[in-house]
């Protein structure tokens, strides 16, 4: 995007590429660093698979940053020096004039944006108060059983078979790896210390699913068909829940502090904090609103928290790009009205924002549709978070920063009524 902007200014291809990389470096560095901060928080407060996810996230971000900044530039420069890239345009006939020279008055729509955001918050608070959350065994305590059958089975049918036996307790059945293997989760009598509880539960599983077990005996079922067992006691679940809470809170604080240190402007920090908090709360509220309605598991577990923290990092990426452009435009036109500066920054980064969000959403949608039930909940949270995070950058983070600046008179002199209506 930066190179295309330089080309539109009439610069040569070589100069455009050099200046594009130069001007984009700070935004790319900031956005990647915020995601790495999220990764380290996950690494500290996560357990088991979440630590693995955090490690993968950090390594992939570092690799992506290195290739985006250095490797791609080396390729472009090598191609230009050999005369093979002389006809590069970085556009197609469709994208050439797409979203160029837009003049959307984002700040003029800030009251509408605030109203919609408040309405969403009210709905989500109502859902959390009435329905609560469908907590997985990571947070509520419980047992997991991975069961392999001799033929493909449907999780919904297995769940219906087992409901009478586990009435009054949570029960979740999802497909993992293949159609003949499911994971059954329940918090049935998790607080009891009776030594016979495990045998009682496995007996209930065997009796409840007898119609799909064929001629398998109880011994064959427990020894061969149950692939794995996992128990999370109430005290461990409480520890995981506390760790997840602090992971989210510390991520929000870390992002706000980094933005404050990077841009030296409290309004940017508050705007970022409000935006990512709104995004995270929207995801939590949506899971409260839709669990039991959508045909896949919407449990609140460690994977769900990982999705929220990843979305927080992603949302900050967009916000950092916009704030970096505001700082750049302000440096070029120090006496320009603050509303014009912010609207110009939002419009000039709109193509980049939408391209990044759309490409990410397409990948997540493919994973959501083609992936298994195990990651469907995670990808759904990510997909929804990308959409809400993009919208909150445009209609929550930046307008809040503007309102703080306008009210405290931290920047410029007097806003133009024409541009702030």
Regions found by a protein language model. Give the residues of each.
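Internal alpha-helical transmembrane segments of multipass membrane proteins
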Residues: 33-42, 241-282, 286, 357-369
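Single conserved hydrophobic/aromatic residue that forms the stacking wall/gate
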Residues: 412-421
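Structural signature of multi-pass, alpha-helical inner-membrane proteins
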Residues: 46, 81-265, 271, 290-301, ...
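Helix-loop junctions and hydrophobic alpha-helical segments within the transmembrane domains
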Residues: 7-33, 333-351
